[in-house]
Swiss-Prot record:
It comes from Duck hepatitis B virus (isolate white Shanghai duck S31). The chain crosses the membrane at residues 166-186, 239-259, 293-313. Residues 68-123 are annotated as: Disordered. The lineage of its organism: Viruses, Riboviria, Pararnavirae, Artverviricota, Revtraviricetes. This is Large envelope protein. The gene is S. The record marks L240, R241 as: Cleavage.
Amino acid sequence: MGQQPAKSMDVRRIEGGELLLNQLAGRMIPKGTVTWSGKFPTIDHLLDHVQTMEEVNTLQQQGAWPAGAGRRLGLTNPAPQEPPQPQWTPEEDQKAREAFRRYQEERPPETTTIPPTSPTPWKLQPGDDPLLENKSLLETHPLYQNPEPAVPVIKTPPLRKKKMAGTFGGILAGLIGLLVGFFLLIKILEILRRLDWWWISLSSPKGKMQCAFQDTGAQISPHYAGFCPWGCPGFLWTYLRLFIIFLLILLVAAGLLYLTDNMSIILGKLQWESVSALFSSISSLLPSDQKSLVALMFGLLLIWMTSSSATQTLVTLTQLATLSALFYKN
């Protein structure tokens, strides 16, 4: 009772080989604590694995594996049985040769085939395919077309947000421009009046500087020529003289511009070495930056407008020398 049949020698050899492989494989499996990363074995595990594999290779080279014991590690049998080689008798070999010869004779002859020609390239014209007319599959397919909304949507253009800083800056710039223009207009009229007074003083004696039109019966107070109020007949003549003086100034400015274009020719003919040396020395002292030149001329203009007659004469001479040197430099 309870007796099991005796195991054969082959079964015992297989079981013994499996026990040996289990012991060897147990040494290759890391046991105990692992490293801080939790992924790699320690150096002791690696050394055990190397030693175990050396023993396994030694046993395999010696052919010490029992039959069927290599399936645990996937190792092949070190001494596999060679497959039986087919043995052909001369009669069987002759029969095979005869059968192959008959097959070659009975085989139908090959028909001459035409080599395949390369297909002609297919080129689409713009009118052949709707995809080439700036459309896509999604646009042409009815399922992907945008359906019309049930409620009409009114699209309004986006309103641009105006920045208060930009608006205030534009208004401030406009006010400053008007103020500067009004100031320059007043100063230009003042300059023209002074030139007109100088002209009158040259052509009239000092005792007769009063307006000649104030004795024509107009109800106006006594005044000097060139300062006629509204209602005096000399008012229009005064502004006519101012306009003539303004035209003369423009003519002088145009002449200076013409001289700047032909300065080298004129200086070459007149041989003004001293003048050219003076202009070159002044131009060497001038700044090269245009903004600095504008600031210099504007500063001289402000000094001229807010100073006395003697200082204005000096500033005027300085301005003329600076402009002449600047024209000579250019």
